[in-house]
Amino acid sequence: EDAYKFTTW
């Protein structure tokens, strides 16, 4: 999953 693409940290 690309759940890191919407993280800002």
From Swiss-Prot:
Broad class of the protein's primary localization: secreted
Domain of life: Eukaryota
GO cellular component: extracellular region
Keywords assigned: Cell wall, Secreted
Subcellular location: Secreted, Cell wall
Protein name: 60 kDa cell wall protein
Organism, as annotated: Phaseolus vulgaris (Kidney bean)
